[in-house]
A protein has these predicted regions:
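Intrinsic-disorder/low-complexity, polar/charged segments enriched in Ser/Thr/Lys/Arg/Asp/Glu/Gln
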Residues: 7-15, 46, 58, 69, ...
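A conserved amphipathic terminal alpha-helix motif
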Residues: 122-163
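Hydrophobic pocket/interface hotspot
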Residues: 23-27, 59, 74, 85, ...
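Solvent-exposed alpha-helix faces
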Residues: 28-32, 79, 147
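Hydrophobic ligand-binding cavity/cleft-lining segments
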Residues: 1-46, 163
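Hydrophobic-ligand binding "helix-grip"
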Residues: 35, 49-50, 64-114, 122
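Short beta-edge strand/loop motif at the mouth of beta-sheet-based domains
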Residues: 30-71, 160-163
Length: 163
């Protein structure tokens, strides 16, 4: 009997009208400047979103009082073309160091200029009985996050080129 588990992934893409190096840097080094304030798991909506720029680095938030809450870790760091994050939030969006799904972002040249950012949040079947529910929540959350990101990256690309 084949007991294969159905793989569940969410895929989204968006075009940012800026070079890949700027787009990658904006997603990682400037995440706090564009990350939606509504998307946090710590106790305060006043927080700093941080991606440590290396394999094994943390992906986390730090609130105004200095309390840090982990979201996951960096699994692959390949500027300016690829970032692989380990999402370590369970079905209640609480940090679990023993749980991991993957969020892969690729940054590719768009026809006519700019960068196509493709996001795949995969291994969602690992949520077990909650997989379909969590996939639906993730599917509705990433478009808002990517729109905030693209808007910020677009608005700041000419400023970077001028400096």
């Amino acid at each position: 009997m084949d007991m294969a588990v159905k793989q569940i992934a969410v895929r989204k893409s968006i075009t940012v009208y800026a070079p890949a190096a700027h787009v990658f840097r904006t997603f990682t080094a400037n995440q706090n400047d564009w990350w939606p304030r509504s998307h946090h798991i710590g106790g305060s909506d006043r927080f700093t979103a941080i991606v440590e720029p290396r394999v094994g680095g943390r992906w986390f938030e730090r609130d105004a009082e200095g309390v840090e809450t982990n979201w996951g870790k960096v699994l692959a760091w390949e500027p300016p073309t690829r970032l692989l994050l380990g999402w370590q939030l369970d079905s209640r969006f609480a940090y679990d160091p023993n749980f991991l799904t993957e969020v892969e972002l690729t940054f590719a040249l768009a026809a006519g200029g700019g960068t196509i950012v493709t996001l795949e949040h995969r291994n969602l079947e690992r949520f077990g009985a909650d997989a379909e529910k969590v996939a639906a929540e993730i599917d509705s959350g990433w478009p808002q996050i990517l729109a905030e990101f693209a808007g910020y990256a677009d608005a700041h690309s000419s400023m970077e080129a001028a400096s």
